[in-house]
Amino acid sequence: MELIEQVSVAKKANIYFEGKVASRSVFFNDGSKQTLGVVLPGEYEFSTSQGEIMQVTSGSFEVLLPDSTTWQTFSEGSQFELVANASFKIRNSAIAEYCCSYL
């Protein structure tokens, strides 16, 4: 199991899509932040306010990246990058988890 050390974690979860997507914010001593999330099966559309790197930590997602017409599969251990102020879609048929780093 990979650990994140020397951090503060928000007690309250960020809940989206009627509880089907949930994440917790993790704050580092240097001021940076990540979110760790779990996504129940479904299809969801998200928007970014800043650049992000999404790492799949469990399961897999199909992702429709901004300005793309083709869904791409990202499995455990893979990642994709998103620019600020963009929308993207994810879908999954089983529970999946992610770690989001902000650029």
UniProtKB/Swiss-Prot annotation:
Keyword Methyltransferase: no
Catalytic activity: a purine D-ribonucleoside + phosphate = a purine nucleobase + alpha-D-ribose 1-phosphate; adenosine + phosphate = alpha-D-ribose 1-phosphate + adenine; cytidine + phosphate = cytosine + alpha-D-ribose 1-phosphate; guanosine + phosphate = alpha-D-ribose 1-phosphate + guanine
Entry EC no(s): 2.4.2.1, 2.4.2.2
Classification via InterPro entries: Ppnp, RmlC-like_jellyroll, RmlC_Cupin_sf
Domain of life of the native organism: Bacteria
A Pfam short name: Ppnp
GO annotations of cellular component type: cytosol
The UniProt record lists the keyword Iron-sulfur: no
Function of the protein: Catalyzes the phosphorolysis of diverse nucleosides, yielding D-ribose 1-phosphate and the respective free bases. Can use uridine, adenosine, guanosine, cytidine, thymidine, inosine and xanthosine as substrates. Also catalyzes the reverse reactions.
Family affiliation: Belongs to the nucleoside phosphorylase PpnP family.
Protein name per the record: Pyrimidine/purine nucleoside phosphorylase
Organism, as annotated: Shewanella sp. (strain MR-4)
